[in-house]
């Protein structure tokens, strides 16, 4: 069996055996595979913007945006498209090649879709890859986003099926898999990963990666998050994960999903430069860039560029910018907003009722 073979039939015992390798052997295997598929000194940079913050009805025990927990987070309405475009332009100027937009929803409502599809069109017109994370998607919603040109859709599995019920009770594991299936069927690329350091066992980290690697097609991007403990959430006092276990998770993800981008996501703000360097060597080749990830802290842009310089890394170049499309899209946007505003007489209707599931 080739070291570089793409497989979808991983046994959990095989993955656990990879986790158990001596660190030097694991890193050597992961880095060898990484060099086969990617330039090891190139890192894809994404910017993540919260386009609708707080008041989420879900009970994810790690999340400060849940309406069920008192975290001091102020809820915000869906951002105007012009504000999103301003942030997207800033992201591109700072070196990002992908712009991700996240909304704290269980799922978008149909009346939200015109706004969302216009956001996608306008951001793409700037020459950025686009990604959204909006919660669960129906088949029709997936098709609308794909039709607008959305490149990636993020929907994480979070953890293993076995540990999932200890983290979330308001959304089933199968519903997450169904959303990924809808996204893939629509033609969009899938971004899906999980969170480690939530009190799970090593077998749960193996189980999460098994679920991702055994999808019919591997996710195009696999974000691996280190839990950011937020006061007011049920997981605020959970024990820290050994940082080397995080590195092992990155390395195993690279080995069993050799063609996927593996992203260092939440938690980087508290990671040392040395730890991040190990993660890049282990196969991580994507980061979120900017001082905030939705509502949690992230390293400053200057810090990231300084680290890149010290490590000899360089940002991946994004697609060419069809800037001439922007004026046309902005005209369309103004007409769309005028039409859609008639459907939203009350500002509070732009939120989900946190008490209604």
UniProtKB/Swiss-Prot annotation:
Catalyzes the conversion of dethiobiotin (DTB) to biotin by the insertion of a sulfur atom into dethiobiotin via a radical-based mechanism. It catalyses: (4R,5S)-dethiobiotin + (sulfur carrier)-SH + 2 reduced [2Fe-2S]-[ferredoxin] + 2 S-adenosyl-L-methionine = (sulfur carrier)-H + biotin + 2 5'-deoxyadenosine + 2 L-methionine + 2 oxidized [2Fe-2S]-[ferredoxin]. PROSITE patterns: RADICAL_SAM. Binds 1 [4Fe-4S] cluster. The cluster is coordinated with 3 cysteines and an exchangeable S-adenosyl-L-methionine. GO terms for biological process: biotin biosynthetic process. [2Fe-2S] cluster binds at residues 100, 131, 191, 263. The lineage of its organism: Bacteria, Pseudomonadati, Pseudomonadota, Gammaproteobacteria, Alteromonadales. It is an enzyme of class 2 (transferase). This is Biotin synthase.
């Amino acid at each position: 069996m080739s070291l570089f073979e793409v497989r979808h039939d991983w046994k959990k015992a095989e993955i656990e055996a990879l986790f158990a390798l001596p660190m030097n052997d694991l890193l050597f295997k992961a880095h060898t595979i990484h060099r086969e598929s990617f330039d090891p000194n190139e890192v894809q940079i994404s910017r993540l913007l919260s386009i609708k913050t707080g008041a989420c009805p879900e009970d994810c025990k790690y999340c400060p945006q849940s309406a069920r927990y008192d975290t001091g987070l102020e809820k915000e309405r869906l951002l105007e498209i012009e504000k999103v475009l301003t942030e997207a332009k800033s992201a591109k100027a700072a070196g990002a090649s992908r712009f991700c937009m996240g909304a704290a929803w269980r799922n978008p409502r149909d009346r939200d879709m015109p706004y969302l599809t216009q956001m996608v069109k306008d951001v793409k017109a700037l020459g950025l890859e686009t990604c959204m994370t909006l919660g669960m998607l129906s088949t029709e919603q997936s098709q609308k986003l794909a039709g607008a040109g959305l490149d990636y859709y993020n929907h994480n599995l979070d953890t293993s099926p076995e540990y999932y019920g200890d983290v979330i009770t308001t959304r089933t594991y199968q519903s997450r898999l169904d959303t990924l299936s809808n996204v893939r069927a629509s033609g969009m690329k899938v971004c899906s990963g999980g969170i480690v350091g939530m009190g799970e066992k090593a077998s749960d980290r193996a189980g999460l990666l098994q679920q991702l690697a055994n999808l019919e097609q591997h996710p195009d991007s696999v974000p691996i998050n280190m839990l950011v403990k937020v006061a007011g959430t049920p997981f605020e006092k959970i024990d820290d994960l050994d940082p080397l276990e995080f590195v092992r998770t990155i390395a195993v993800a690279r080995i069993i999903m050799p063609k996927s981008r593996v992203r260092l996501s939440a938690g980087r703000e508290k990671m040392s430069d040395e730890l991040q360097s190990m993660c890049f060597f282990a196969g991580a080749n994507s980061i979120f860039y900017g001082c905030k990830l939705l509502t949690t802290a992230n390293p400053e842009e200057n810090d990231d560029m300084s680290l890149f310089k010290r490590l000899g890394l360089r940002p991946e170049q994004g697609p060419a910018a069809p800037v001439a499309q922007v004026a046309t899209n902005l005209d369309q946007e103004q007409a769309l907003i005028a039409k859609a505003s008639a459907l939203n007489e009350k500002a509070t209707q732009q939120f989900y009722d946190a008490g209604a599931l």
